[in-house]
Amino acid sequence: MNLPSKIKIGGHQYSVVFPYVFTERFDRCGDHDGSTNTIRIADNEFNVKRADSSITVTLIHEILHAIDQTTGHDMFQGSEGEKHIEALSEGIYQVLIDNPELRKGV
């Protein structure tokens, strides 16, 4: 799977590192670092290759974290915030997949 190496979010240029190996935490699939404007996405989880759909949902998830931080809202903090981000990520992915005409106009 190919992901863009750069994404602009809220006027900020983010680097996307893919594939990234999380040596510090094996249970992590993605990470957003607002201090370095970096999004890291793993292509493996517990030594198993991840599906492209899962990788895309993770990218959306980390983009939502970046939007939340760059807008200064910080609405999605803590475990409850993660649940909301996860639900939004899956929902946005489903809408984009189920409605390809939306992707054409973007």
Q: What is the role of each PLM region?
A:
Residues 1-53, 70-106:
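Metalloprotease/metallohydrolase-associated module, dominated by Zn2+-dependent proteases
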Residues 57-69:
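Active-site recognition of the HExxH zinc-binding catalytic motif
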